[in-house]
């Protein structure tokens, strides 16, 4: 079989990047070829890149393959004989011993479920990759939630009825799903794995756990509690808050940064203070509500406000709940002392 060198190099790198986002390689430093795919395998994450030219199954050392790929600009012919794999490029040849892949890796879903079109976007919207204590993402039939082990659920985003209920993905699995691609086209629940297929044909398989294993308990309790909370005030917070943050002199890229945003409410106005490596920056805006108080939140909910200016503050078991109704983001916060 003949494979384009550039494609093979990119495919191997993509597999490695996805797997390295996980908990380490189960088959350390190996690249696996199975019919139709090039694959990297980790202890809880598998990444497969489609390659129609692969017509047999074998496993080779990644470092040796990388060396071959770095020495040639030619397409690579791959020949398998009884006990070795021969990579032929130009006038050079590289013969590598190979191992048969574990039989379980040959299994692959034949039927794909209909995936929510915005699955990766919603997973990303509740992930806190740089947040201390970030544990991962959970979902049930009603919602996704970002989980922080030190203070339970931080952000909840509604809607994921097509996924297996009560699943929890550790932070490493979430990172792998996000790295693998952005547009999801199919999902298979293959307990204990979820296989996610992307628009370019890449497949990322991640090991999930039951949400009951996480100390926050059933996710639905948080959804129900939020829906039953009492409204403190309601107003057009979104655009004003955005203007307050963006208008602070010297503050840039707040929406892409993992920074805390401090919000102080007073009748008729709100004050926003944000921090990054360059210092502290301030902004003010009008607020039509009567709520008085202060809390801290990551910048991500304000990013969601780009799609909606409606915001509602609720009291849920002594916590402040900020809901961006049309933007589909819910945040459970504890008021700052």
Predicted feature residues:
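Structural preference for solvent-exposed beta-strand-turn elements
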Residues: 1-337
């Amino acid at each position: 079989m003949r494979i384009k060198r550039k494609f093979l190099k990119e495919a191997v790198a993509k597999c490695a990047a996805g797997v390295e986002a996980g908990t380490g390689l189960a088959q350390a430093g190996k690249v696996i070829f199975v019919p139709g795919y090039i694959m990297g395998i980790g202890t809880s994450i598998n990444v497969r890149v489609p390659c129609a030219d692969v017509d047999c199954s074998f496993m080779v050392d990644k470092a040796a393959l990388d060396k071959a790929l770095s020495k040639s600009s030619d397409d690579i012919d791959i020949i398998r004989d009884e006990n070795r794999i021969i990579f032929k490029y130009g006038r050079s040849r590289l013969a590598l011993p190979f191992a048969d892949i574990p039989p379980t890796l040959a299994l692959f879903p034949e039927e794909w479920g209909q995936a929510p079109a915005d699955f990766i976007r919603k997973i990303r919207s509740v992930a806190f990759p740089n947040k201390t204590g970030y544990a991962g993402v959970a979902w049930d039939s009603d919602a996704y939630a970002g989980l922080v082990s030190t203070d339970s659920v931080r952000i909840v985003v509604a809607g994921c009825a097509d996924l297996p209920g009560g699943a929890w993905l550790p932070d490493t699995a979430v990172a792998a799903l996000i790295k693998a691609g952005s547009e999801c086209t199919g999902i298979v629940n293959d307990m204990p794995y979820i296989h996610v297929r992307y628009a370019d044909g890449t497949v990322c398989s991640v090991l999930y756990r039951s949400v009951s294993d996480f100390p926050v308990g059933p996710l639905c309790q948080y959804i129900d509690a939020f829906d039953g909370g009492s409204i403190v005030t309601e107003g057009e917070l979104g655009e004003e808050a955005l203007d307050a943050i963006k208008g602070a002199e010297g503050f840039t890229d707040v929406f892409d940064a993992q920074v805390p945003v401090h919000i102080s409410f007073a009748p008729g106005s709100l004050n926003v203070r944000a921090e990054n490596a360059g210092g502290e920056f301030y902004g003010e805006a009008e607020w039509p509500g009567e709520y008085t108080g202060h809390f801290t939140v990551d910048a991500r909910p304000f990013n969601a406000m780009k799609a909606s200016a409606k915001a509602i503050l609720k009291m849920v078991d002594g916590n402040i709940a900020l809901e961006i109704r049309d933007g589909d983001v819910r945040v459970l916060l504890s008021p700052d002392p």
